[in-house]
């Protein structure tokens, strides 16, 4: 199976740009910039994660802007990367900064992306999830149930994993009312 990798580089204008490269049968292919990422990016783009449901059918996520201001997702179908897009609906949740931190695909065109964002009420950090169904990304929503737990406004979602049957789980940490970090997991089915 071709296994993509993600990374970053500094271009001639001293801006961070993101790239992907695929390995197949022990040989690495040419690194490419995901289409559309340069148009989104005002500098400092980086990939956070990549996940493949099958060879040539992958998704990647990360952040772009100054400094890492907005989250993006991109999908590869049959070996061709589609255009990188801002995570749909994320701008409605965030007041300032957002980052897509992890993506996982259950099957081609069916993925989940998670991350965190600073909301407009005092810069508190919250968690979001966005789901891709049949190749179309839905709007990002706040992770259900996380808001009341996160009384001090410090969420970090580190990972999401989706099984082939379509069930996903995500985990991370939040800051409780005593200023202690606590772990959490959340699951989604269907």
List each language-model region with its residue ranges:
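Residue-level hotspots at or immediately adjacent to binding/recognition sites across diverse folds
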Residues: 1-190
């Amino acid at each position: 199976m071709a296994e993509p990798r993600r990374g970053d580089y500094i271009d001639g204008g001293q801006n961070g740009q993101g790239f992907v490269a695929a390995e197949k049968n022990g040989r690495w292919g040419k690194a490419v910039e995901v289409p559309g990422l340069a148009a989104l990016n005002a500098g400092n783009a980086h990939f956070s994660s990549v996940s493949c449901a099958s060879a040539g059918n992958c998704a990647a996520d990360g952040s772009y802007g100054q400094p890492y201001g907005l989250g993006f997702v991109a999908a590869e179908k049959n070996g061709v990367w589609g255009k990188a897009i801002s995570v749909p609906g994320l701008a409605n949740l965030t007041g300032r900064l957002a980052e897509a931190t992890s993506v996982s695909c259950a099957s081609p065109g069916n993925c989940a992306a998670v991350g965190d964002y600073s909301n407009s009420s005092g810069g508190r950090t919250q968690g979001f999830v966005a789901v891709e169904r049949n190749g179309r990304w839905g709007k990002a929503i706040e992770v259900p149930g996380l808001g009341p737990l996160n009384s001090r406004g410090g969420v970090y979602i580190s990972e999401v994993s989706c099984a082939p049957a379509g069930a996903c789980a995500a985990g991370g940490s939040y800051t409780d009312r005593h200023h202690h970090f606590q772990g959490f997991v959340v699951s989604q089915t269907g």
